[in-house]
Amino acid sequence: MKKWLIIAVSLAIAIVLFMYTKGEAKAAGMTVGYTTGDTASYNSLTKYHTYMNAIATDTFAFEKNGQIIGDAPTKQLTYAKKKKIKTWAVISNYNDAIYDFDGDLASRVMSNKTAKKRFTDQLITLAKKHSYYGINIDFEAVNPEDRAAYSNFIQYVSQALNKKHIKTMVSVPAKSADDKNDDWSWPYDYAKIGKYADFVQVMTYDEHGIWGEPGSVASTNWIKSSLQFSVKKIKANKVIMGIPAYGYDWDVKDGSTSTIREWNELKSLIKKQKAKPAFNKKSGSMTFSYVDKKKHKHVVWYENEKTVQTKSHLAKQYKIAGVSVYALGNESESFWKAIRKGTK
């Protein structure tokens, strides 16, 4: 009787634990939420933390001498640690002076031994001080002639961080081939970067943007082509794809008023303009148009719950490490539920 009692009690405990786990389900695979230091990002983290297992705090940059600048969002880091969510510090070459990513700034730090060492040493200090799990290097608009220099830089930094048990993730623009004529993506040698980085975050968003003609922010076939190229050059278990939590609104007549539209903003815009969204089969994305008070026609491209779920599932299809979301702050739970369904 005692044996059967023990079995019965064990079974009951197992059922309770299963139900608890089901209610507090965590993200499957790697799900990274990019955050800033603002209140909206923090609120999203506290609301939707069960849908992610890592955050990347996009609050750091650097100067031409390699000096790291920026502040650690302590509230977010404290909360993430409490919830056992891994944290990454994003270091970008964004330059406030020019309101853009600065290829020359990146080149300076990559080519100058003193600046490179200072940059790397300070990354280690930063990670140790704030208990970051890893460093996410996000150098964008790297100069085309710096392709080899950037690969060598990633090798140098990754090896230095590895010695201190700090992980390295590198963000790269999405591409389906190495094209010397593509100044934006050519500088990133996937194979060499993937050899030394622990993870490579492929930015599978911004296929189109307000800097160009209207179109899908992340069409299905474009993502597929990018992931196919990525896993040929990089081990699949190192690759992370990107999911946009935003869309773009193009003013067809006056491009200067074109703007980004956050996830939560889109539904209210549709309601306000009495727009009729349509699914674009070719891109696998949503689109609609409207006319504003100035009689200007606008074209909007975005993702909804269904398309987010479909595109998130590509992470499973290509057996990659996971997904990343850019960015926390103005998304809803329905967005996160779509990612969870897609990555299951």
Curated annotation (Swiss-Prot):
Report the residue ranges that make up the GH18 domain in this protein.
29-344
Which InterPro entries does the protein's record reference?
CFLE_GH18, Chitinase_II/V-like_cat, Chitinase_insertion_sf, Glyco_hydro18_cat, Glycoside_hydrolase_SF
In Gene Ontology terms, what is a biological process of this protein? carbohydrate metabolic process
UniProt entry tagged with the keyword Hydrolase: yes
Q: Which residues form the signal peptide?
A: 1-27
> Do you know which SUPFAM superfamilies this protein is assigned to?
(Trans)glycosidases (SSF51445)
One GO MF annotation is: hydrolase activity, acting on glycosyl bonds
EC number(s) per UniProt? 3.2.-.-
Record-stated family = Belongs to the glycosyl hydrolase 18 family.
Protein name, as recorded? Uncharacterized glycosylase YvbX
Its source organism is Bacillus subtilis (strain 168)
Gene designation: yvbX
